[in-house]
Design a protein with these regions (language model features):
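Non-catalytic terminal and connector segments of soluble metabolic enzymes
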Residues: 1-139
Length: 139
């Protein structure tokens, strides 16, 4: 049985603004994650609120929604063996200061809020997050 999975990756506004998209993509490819779909978009605060609704009771929710909608983002569907776990390891800890060396967040994250990337935290969430940004892709 193959452990081929898909996961969602978002390159957040801070990294897009600093022109890090190609560098981050090369890290993904080097780590055997295939980019199946990619698009650069600018979402509204309402769309960010819908995407992050699982966090709506948390104190950082409004800031998170404002941040994700503050500039262009790059959303990607990644595919690979155990893609969800693999990508989470490549991303590193949410807080760049605590992230392991050579992870995306350690290399490029500015702060716990502006940590450059988002990745799905489970296979089920990956499916719903992919559907959020690529609604008509897999019907």
């Amino acid at each position: 049985m193959s452990n081929l999975e898909q996961t969602l990756s978002i390159i957040k506004p801070d990294a897009v603004e600093r022109n890090l998209t190609e560098e981050i993509k090369s890290i993904l490819i080097k780590n055997k994650l295939e980019i199946k779909e990619i698009k650069k978009i600018h979402i509204t605060k309402d769309e960010a609120a819908e995407f992050y609704k699982v966090h709506q009771t948390k104190p950082f929710y409004n800031d998170l929604c404002s941040y994700l909608s503050s500039g262009p983002i790059v959303v990607m569907i990644l595919e690979g063996k155990n893609a969800v776990i693999s990508y989470r390891k490549i991303m590193g800890s949410t807080d760049p200061k605590q992230a392991e060396n050579n992870t995306i967040r350690k290399l490029y994250g500015l702060s716990i809020d502006k940590n450059s990337v988002h990745g799905s935290d489970s296979v089920d969430n990956a499916k719903s997050e992919i559907n959020f940004f690529f609604k008509n892709l897999y019907t």
